[in-house]
Amino acid sequence: MPFLSRLFHYGVDLALVSTCVAGIRRSSGISFEVEKIHNEDVKTAVEKYLNFGEWAFDQSSAFLGSSTWFKKV
């Protein structure tokens, strides 16, 4: 059971980091240069990871935007 707990914790941490990277890209325009990765398998994995962050950022923004507890400034 501790293994699954640790695995879940690492998964959530990775998702949060990916979402933060997406937010940084959206707010400042700074992004990770995937083209500098030479290994195609690693490049594909990094692209999927960053795309997940974009999706999570979009979903979070849509959810918070529809809530009455938050307002756009």
UniProtKB/Swiss-Prot annotation:
Q: Example GO molecular function term?
A: membrane destabilizing activity
Primary localization: mitochondrion
Subcellular localization is given as: Mitochondrion intermembrane space
One of this protein's GO BP terms? mitochondrial membrane fission
Null-mutant phenotype, please? Answer: Impairs mitophagy. Does not affect reticulophagy, pexophagy, nor the Cvt pathway that delivers the precursor form of the hydrolase aminopeptidase I to the vacuole.
The answer to whether keyword Membrane applies is no
Matching entries from Pfam families are given as: Mitofissin (PF08520)
Which keywords has UniProt assigned to this entry? Autophagy, Mitochondrion
Q: Which domain of life is it from?
A: Eukaryota
- UniProt GO cellular component terms: cytoplasm; cytosol; mitochondrial intermembrane space
| Functional summary from the UniProt entry | Mitochondrial fission factor that acts directly on lipid membranes to drive mitochondrial fission required for mitophagy. Directly binds to lipid membranes and brings about lipid membrane fragility to facilitate membrane fission and engulfment of mitochondria by the phagophore.
| Database matches in PANTHER family | CHROMOSOME 16, WHOLE GENOME SHOTGUN SEQUENCE (PTHR28075), DUF1748-DOMAIN-CONTAINING PROTEIN (PTHR28075:SF1)
- Protein family: Belongs to the ?ATG44? family.
- Please describe the quaternary structure of this protein: Homooligomer. Found as homooctamer in solution, but binds to membranes either as a monomer, dimer, or tetramer, not as an octamer.
Can you say what this protein is called?
A: Mitofissin
Q: Which gene encodes it?
A: atg44
